[in-house]
Amino acid sequence: MTVFAAEQQFHDAERPLPSHQARLACRAGLAETTAGVAPGFVQGNLAILPEKYAAAFHRFCQLNPKPCPIVGMSDVGNPMIPSLGIDLDIRTDLPRYRVWRDGELVEEPTDIVAHWRDDLVAFVIGCSFSFEEALLADDIPIRHIEEKVRVPMYRTNIPCEPAGPFSGPMVVSMRPLKPKDAIRAIQVTSRFPSVHGAPVHIGLPQSIGIADIAKPDYGDPVPIGPDELPVFWACGVTPQAVIAAAKVPFAITHAPGLMLVTDLKNKHLAVL
């Protein structure tokens, strides 16, 4: 597991970090997509499981680092993850959550205080929103940000390596790009292996099991121009699919596109 130390900098209660401001907004009830929120700061997907299943899920993430790169993990029963942020409370600091029972989605609350238990372990998994900042800095347009919608995500026929009860296909996120931008995007995102890295597929969505690219399994559809290619990255929503398939008695995840904003800096995730 790779856990990055939170950015060390002075914190003034009157001038909180943009990332902390984002979490406080969520705590106050804001429930919107976090794409483009708090530029420069790492965002994460969330998976919360009973301790009984935590070791197997951790192993699943280790075996599948492209869709499931761990950037932080809580102690058992502790909703605070200080390595990821000041005053970060996993129960309140995301815009919206999903509560699962026996593999079925039963609720989508804006906080999980009433659902928290002493046996729960929270995993924060890297999110492609982190490398989007680098793409934008390279003048590569990102359609879902332009359209102000959630990134489209799809179940594929790409199998993940199983671990314990957890198995299933990879989920991918898609961004339409012109060929020259797609080539540059490969180069840019290869520098960020801890937030999914380079694309796993370009073009021909049918070859990875996507029957209709206009109908994403998660998120929102975006237009694809006639001179553009769909570019697919491994996605941190993959754990939701495998947790649902495993039918564990109880689990909590984030709502797709509504992420945890941490105090980690995107620039510190780059390897080159």
UniProtKB/Swiss-Prot annotation:
InterPro entries: D-Glu_cyclase, Putative_hydro-lyase, UPF0317. Its EC number is 4.2.1.-. Keywords: Lyase. GO terms for molecular function: lyase activity. Gene3D superfamilies: PSTPO5379-like, PSTPO5379-like domain. SUPFAM superfamilies: PSTPO5379-like (SSF160920). It is an enzyme of class 4 (lyase). It comes from the Bacteria. Belongs to the D-glutamate cyclase family. PANTHER family: D-GLUTAMATE CYCLASE, MITOCHONDRIAL (PTHR32022:SF10). This is Putative hydro-lyase Rpal_1947. It comes from Rhodopseudomonas palustris (strain TIE-1).
